[in-house]
Amino acid sequence: MKKAILFFLTFLFITRESIVAQRFLADVDSSFYIKDTVRPVIKRFANLRITGYIQPQFQVASANGIESYEGGSFSAHSQSRFMLRRARVKIEYALPSKTSGNPAAFFAFQVDGTERGVAVRDMFLKLFETRKNKFSFTAGLFGRPFGYEVNLSSAYREMPERGRMSQILMPRERDIGAMVSFEPMNKKNKLSNFKFDLGLFNGQGLTGSTDFDSRKDLISRVYCKPYELNDFSISGGLSFLNGGWKNGTKYVYKNGVGQNGDAIFIVDSTQANIDEIAPRRYYGADIQVKKEFKWGATEFRAEYWFGTQPGTSSTSTSPGVLPVANGNPLPTYIRHFNGAFFYFLQNIINEKHQLLLKYDWYDPNVKVKKQQIGKPGTNLTPADIKFATSGIGYIYHLNKQTRVILSYSMVSNEITAMPGFASQLSDNVFTCRLHFIF
């Protein structure tokens, strides 16, 4: 009977305390640092916490079977669907330090269960340096430390999905690797407002079961936490990724100019290209500005990426396995890309109502434009077409744990000479989502 009562009290404590989970992937919520003397009755469980959220939703597309980045493409004969976008449960454990109020170690395990199956999303261990409380080491499966949108948890992101560029270049956001972080925990430290991450990752993320070559991605990010001045705050960061993957063939296509002056892909078929590294380099910068009012807040976010992305003739998506067709490796296409995300968030009337505006674009090949794509002999494909998405949304907060999200995403594509892309596609999506977090 005592064990049953203890378990019940523990469940109530964990549930109540875990409403505020960490806002960013792989971060540790400071409210989780609980001393054994706070609640002696449940001190054996005080450092264990269970959090999670569920996102059932209904969507309507502007046409049947569209390719979409709003939760995945629609079935060939369908333009509406109910789906369980995410349903996640996360177990966290913090090992208290004997010398400070900060943890000595932190373990996290998160699973995602939907109608499409169950998959692991996080499984990592974070060790803290407890003498000066400045450094930590993370190893396992966790979020890549690149950019703001990629690391903002889906439990807190206002629009239903991350931008197209995030999903193509950083599919599923996480990867297996190890990372060192500099983040002074003492607020009196002059650098306590800064965080620096530096990590090595396999590169394939959750899109592959194992690393298909020995090349690793080096990812770093320096982030300035919100600097507050009265009701105004500003934060921002710089990110860098340097990696790549091995060419499976000797054929490597790069941007060039044809004899008639057209922008084309030119093939390099040097035998030495086999097993050479196709460069993958990203550069990113982001800023977040927020103004608080008695009745709510106004927030603006901007983020810009550019760099080099290896892919195939048909896609610029970062691969989880070596790209092949009929068992044979595919030629590598090197593209130079850029893209951005812009958010505007505004409370209206009070904190229960929030208006959302978002704009993002992804240009997979900045060396070519519009009618150049689709010309015979250029080797250009739909994978070189620029897409932009404008989104408008509304959130109604029923309570601290429950909200209703309504959004409409309008997608525009470059008008090209490519069959099927000589006009605007009909691929807009309306989403109605119920979001509950615990």
Task: Give residue spans per PLM region.
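Bacterial Sec-dependent N-terminal signal peptides
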Residues: 1-24
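Outer-membrane beta-barrel biogenesis signature
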Residues: 19-51, 62-71, 249, 401-402, ...
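Short, charged N-terminal helix-start/capping segments
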Residues: 22-55, 113-117, 214-224, 270-282, ...
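Outer-membrane beta-barrel pore domains
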Residues: 24-25, 63, 75-76, 232-240, ...
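Outer membrane beta-barrel
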Residues: 39-63, 70, 74-206, 212-219, ...
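Short, solvent-exposed loop/turn segments at secondary-structure boundaries
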Residues: 208-213, 418-422
